[in-house]
């Protein structure tokens, strides 16, 4: 099941639940008449209803939309009508939620709704007529899931009003309609749908069949042809089309939608872009504007389609990730190409500034590059025309937001600077977290290019270009809490491996203490990635997992546990046991649930308690497992069982039960593997652990880990057979790329990671090298090539550098490509590009690069476990049998 992640980015350092951030925006409220009541359904909605009254189970919902500056007036009018007619209604609770409901990225099926009314069908026509008369002078965004009533911002759709109850005579939830004794899904789509078989009131029949009114029929004749959509958002679509036999881009703007932090809506931004393009029409590298106007309710901007691809796509195709050493005759000469690209961008920006136009949203996706490396700068909708008006950079892509109050000119140059940094070292999102991070990426990027024998002069010239751009930005006084974070600029080129290793271990130790004292310990004791904010069990994201990693760090540094640590450990262990015994946990998996927590108790030397809990709850864990996967399913639960069995921690009876379950699991898998995990490529790109079906943690390779460990324990051939079947099935969703690497295929990308890709499969083959079929031994080299890249976006264990290097280390034991000490040294050197200096220590920004995390999957915990794998010469992330 896919998870809905409740998080926000308002905390400057950490991911936090949106519920933990107070809403300080203006609240919507109306006086409450006698015999009425009010309650908050949730943070977003306030419901008002007459006492001792009932509403229909389902019916015609009446939705009201509003312009932001008319919202209070509309609420007062609608509430008075509802009060007078005793009609239940609800409204958004605050201005913050109003803006979110009308923002660019909101689901189009729910956007625009400010007030929802629930009239009984007998009152519907009269209610609509009264509202229409009172709201004629108001405007609001079109609600795409509904149909507009007449001229006012009133919209209707048929849907569920409430859950069913005993009086209804049937049982169904708020997602289900009952039509003619059939139960159907109440779909919230971005289009008006009338449920099949619905009996429609007479006065609505003609309304449903008629087209929405258009003031001027001629205004709906499109002067351009739309060929296909590129993307949809709440603000409108972006399309490819044709205008006067010329290929064009058509940008649609829906009024009063796409409200951003600067208060501008989609139409305002489109008008701004039109003005900018007209003034820049003679500048090379800026697309021409061909047409602008209103059609029906929406506005359209038609611009020249520039040939080429977005610069971020160009980067993925050309960055020297696996290329051979630089050779003038054979290389694409990456460094000279990116120098030319940056110089072209500088020229365009200088020309625009000379006309007093400032782009304000320069980033990789807004730059188009053709096959000849010619550059175009597109998407001028954020443009401003006052160079001296200092402001905060409110609308920006991740990694491209300038710091503090600054001028529009400086905002543009910061964008160019960050583009240049990205082309040198693509992981620049951390720039939003750490002021001056570009100094760190320039060092890391230079080291990558040095591997390809680019001359020192070439590299220095590019660094000088970066320095020139940096001077255009100026210095900012950082006053936010993130001022405690600094770029990690330590030079360690000539130090010994032992000193490098000790330095990073000590840095992680000091940094952990600094973070612990800054983190507000309300529900969680450590900051984690948003994937794990609501998952405080299992190995991946739990507090106990972080504590295990920290305990491993103390052991490596030979630092005794102090009283504060011991008190915290006792508290977390006690809390974990109480939660398990209290049956208050729904997740049972190894990485996200109870079985993982029990395994961690053993890792923390609470072995007797871990064995007792597993024995007591084993059958319930098995019966309530959600799926078959290692990450969150039956496979991980059984794996903990054979780990404990091999150590003699379980009674004979429990061991027999575990072994019987594994035997049934294995036989069923051999005969019907497709029923365990789909053997098809994932079409959608995602790092979400609940949306992936490949790799060691989520795919057939994870099942293979269980089969391999069971064979090591029992030497029964059926488990060896199942292991080979699992590798065969895993490989069905892998592909070889142009560099000869073998990687997991997902959507239009391929992945080498420990959790989902080449690295994890390589670890499985390494651990079972002596018992797998020869054909699978032969692919180890291609998997090794996949993890032996020059760059990775993030530093973490599951989906980042740490996991890749651990996998490379163990695969190399059979391949002997390099000395394994060199792999550890490379890992530490490359990790320097991601480290953040805090106090006397260092910390890590997890996957995404936006916030500090300490979990095992993405942050501090994963770095520590990776280092321990190297130092202990053992893959310690997953349970393994003791023989």
Show where each model-derived region lies.
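Juxta-kinase regulatory segment immediately upstream of eukaryotic protein kinase catalytic domains
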Residues: 2-19, 171-228
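ATP-binding glycine-rich loop module of kinase domains
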Residues: 58-68, 227-229, 234-273
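Catalytic-loop of the protein kinase fold
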Residues: 349-369
